[in-house]
Amino acid sequence: MNARCEPVYFGDESKKIILGDALTELKKLPSESVDLIFADPPYNIGKDFDGMVESWDEEAFLAWLFECIDECHRILKPHGTMYIMNSTENMPYIDLKCRQLFTIKSRIVWSYDSSGVQAKNYFGSMYEPILMMVKDQKNYTF
């Protein structure tokens, strides 16, 4: 969602980390070429990351996120596995979208202490949900 992000590549052809705009870089990858994906997309909560503010119209944000998930499905090998984490508010939408494409193997809860979440008038979320999903539920990368 940020066109100003220039891609940076680490590694060689057999193993690669790409730092760049997710959708732009995903579209460059060949179909069924990736064994494992761990995605931690923006949460769209209005946070400022060095001048880049996560604040989009909800419908546009979900459309962008779902397109990224579609691209991840396209590039994942038949035995591949994808993990995706996001906010507790967004995860129900992500879960529904991913069930259309994948088999959900696990719903993981990453629990942490309250040091980063300070809520005075409500109970703050002290966990983040992670989905583990596969294309083939009997033969997959773990």
PLM regions with names:
Residues 2-142:
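Core catalytic lobe of class I
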